Swiss-Prot record:
Organism: Rhodococcus erythropolis (strain PR4 / NBRC 100887)
Keywords assigned: ATP-binding, Ligase, Metal-binding, Nucleotide-binding, Zinc
Known catalytic reactions: 1D-myo-inositol 2-amino-2-deoxy-alpha-D-glucopyranoside + L-cysteine + ATP = 1D-myo-inositol 2-(L-cysteinylamino)-2-deoxy-alpha-D-glucopyranoside + AMP + diphosphate + H(+)
Official protein name in the record: L-cysteine:1D-myo-inositol 2-amino-2-deoxy-alpha-D-glucopyranoside ligase
UniProt-annotated binding residues for L-cysteinyl-5'-AMP: C43, G44, I45, T46, T58, N81, V82, T83, W227, G249, S250, D251, I283
Region spans: Disordered: 1-21
Enzyme class: ligase
Length: 413
């Protein structure tokens, strides 16, 4: 699947401290220690409703990780999937009387446009679930052969399920107890009451063909992949096991990320799918959770269509800490627009105070679990001093603009 256009990053003098991120599995902030090549997998959209601000906030978070790694000289191998075969996609297509393939193609194209407008660096591998069906089939075959998965006794719909107890470490990523797992499993796409399952938490890895649904051939009959196994297969076949960062929204911790890790660990025998599990908070609107069911989603494309500068959208989403649930309001956008105006005014000056210390503080705050509120405050301080007329460094405005571009993804020129 085609990604979107890359952009060259300005070179910024100096070097920041090593990146530290909160690890969901370890419940603490700890160093991220990639080698020369840094590897990251971030779960992509299901293309039927793109791109709302919750999506955007997640991809902006991991764009910062990508930029920090590049700034440190790493070669970044970033992989992102598109869940272009899944129940919500079919449901939306049926509701609107539209072909699910056409819907998926259109929404994926819109997502790419939004990401490019927001200046999100593209993944090296941008892979649709449809493209990876053969990889999923290979994994499911392995699971069935090893006993990690089984076919339910159902002559009409012989689905294949992965045993929740197939790995002894299952549950380490979320840290949830059984009751919490069962609650989220039922709420987030699971089927605990499916007749024939051995354990309510067993996860679907191959859905037998149903009328009106797409299907692909397999040794266990025609059907399509389950959700969690798609990410396991895509990641394993591109960056392998033990990659540096797996990312996504906090609503993916369980069951999606817990099971994708369990699938991969069962296949490889490794104890840990990713070295770091990183999750972003949810975005609300005016004090309410932003969700499809509430009908209060705010879309990047709608804001762009209203003439809002994508840099202001980006800056507004970066104004809160990535791990916090936070609200999007008119005031957040207005504050971002005002901040952007001040920064651009400062970057256009002929001279200003030295920006060296400010750039160092920007790097320091971003390296400390992506502390964007402190990073933005540091930049605000320099911009105010510059506009007030202090400083005679003719290189400083350009250095400031380059650092904001390279590290935050915001163009001031």
């Amino acid at each position: 699947m085609q990604s979107w256009s890359d952009t060259a990053l300005p070179s910024v003098p100096g070097q920041g401290p090593p990146l530290r991120l909160y690890d969901t599995a370890d419940r603490q902030v700890r160093p991220v220690t990639p080698g020369k090549k840094a590897t990251m997998y971030v779960c992509g959209i299901t293309p039927y409703d793109a791109t709302h601000l919750g999506h955007a906030a997640t991809y902006l978070t991991f764009d910062l990780v990508n930029r920090i790694w590049r700034d440190a000289g790493h070669d970044v191998h970033y992989v992102q999937n598109v869940t272009d075969v899944d129940d919500p996609l079919f449901e939306r297509a049926n509701r609107d009387g539209e072909d699910w393939i056409v819907l998926g193609i259109r929404e994926t194209a819109l997502f790419r446009e939004d990401m490019e407008a927001l200046r999100v660096l593209p993944p090296k591998d941008y892979i649709g679930a449809v493209e990876s069906v053969n990889e999923v089939v290979e994994l499911v075959e392995k699971f069935v052969a090893s006993g990690a998965a089984y076919i339910v006794d159902d002559a009409e719909f012989p689905d294949v399920y992965f045993r929740a107890d197939a790995t002894e470490q299952f549950g380490y990523e979320s840290g949830y107890d059984r009751a919490t797992m069962e609650k989220f499993f039922a709420e987030r796409g699971g089927d605990p009451d499916r007749v024939g399952k051995r354990n309510p938490l067993d996860a679907l890895v191959w859905r037998a063909e149903r009328p009106g649904e797409p299907s692909w051939p397999s040794p266990f009959g025609p059907g399509r992949p389950g959700w969690h196994i798609e990410c396991a297969a895509i990641a394993l076949n591109r960056i392998g096991s033990g990659f540096d960062v797996q990312g996504g929204g906090s609503d993916l911790i369980f069951p999606h990320h817990e099971f994708s890790a369990a699938h991969a660990e069962s296949a490889t025998g490794d104890r840990r799918f990713a070295r770091h599990y990183v999750h972003t908070g949810m975005i609300g609107l005016d004090g309410e959770k932003m969700s499809k069911s509430r009908g209060n989603l705010v879309f990047v494309s709608k804001l762009r269509g209203e003439g809002v500068d994508p840099a202001a959208i980006r800056l507004g989403l970066l104004s809160g800490h990535y791990r916090q649930d936070r609200a999007w309001t008119d005031q957040v956008l207005e504050d971002a627009q005002s901040r952007l105006k001040v920064w651009r005014e400062a970057a256009a000056l002929d001279s200003a105070p030295s920006a060296t210390d400010t750039v160092a503080r920007l790097r320091q705050h971003l390296a400390d679990d992506l502390d964007t509120p402190k990073a933005l405050d540091a930049l605000d301080g320099w911009a105010r001093r510059a506009i007030e007329g202090g400083g005679s460094d003719t290189q400083a405005p350009g250095e400031f603009a380059d650092a904001v571009d390279a590290l935050l993804g915001i163009s001031l020129r």
